[in-house]
């Protein structure tokens, strides 16, 4: 009934979202510091630090740091087009074969970006670099 396919659309979108925030830098005490970025919830990172079996071992978090995670997927009816509308695509393996495909179904992906900073000025520098990308 169904033909197997995997276009990696979700994976590519998650990577593109992370690329927006990769390489942010802040200025601290006259030197430029790169802000590390991780994929996954902040709570998981903090829980891993707290579950250290050696209680005498000092642990430290490198601050500032950012993390992001994919939190949800919802259908977006406002971008829906007619379900019978089709478009033609060429087969990537053989450029001569033309296939018809139905219009894709619109979904909205939700992400959460967390920023952990020791100083308020560090957080403001990060936010000021992020906000111009969004309306």
Which ranges hold each PLM region?
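Charged, amphipathic alpha-helical segments and their flanking helix caps
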Residues: 1-29, 77, 89-135
């Amino acid at each position: 009934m169904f033909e197997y396919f995997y276009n990696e659309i979700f994976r590519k979108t998650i990577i593109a979202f992370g690329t927006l925030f990769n390489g942010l830098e802040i200025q601290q005490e006259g030197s430029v510091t790169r802000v590390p970025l991780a994929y996954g919830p902040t709570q998981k990172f903090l829980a891993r630090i707290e579950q250290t079996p050696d209680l005498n071992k000092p642990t430290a978090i490198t601050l500032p740091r950012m993390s992001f995670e994919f939190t949800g997927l919802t259908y977006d009816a406002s971008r829906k087009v007619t379900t019978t509308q089709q478009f033609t695509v060429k087969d990537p393996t053989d450029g001569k074969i033309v296939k018809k495909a139905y219009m894709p179904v619109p979904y909205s992906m939700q992400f959460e970006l967390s920023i952990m900073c020791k100083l308020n000025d560090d957080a403001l520098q990060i936010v000021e670099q992020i906000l111009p990308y969004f309306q």
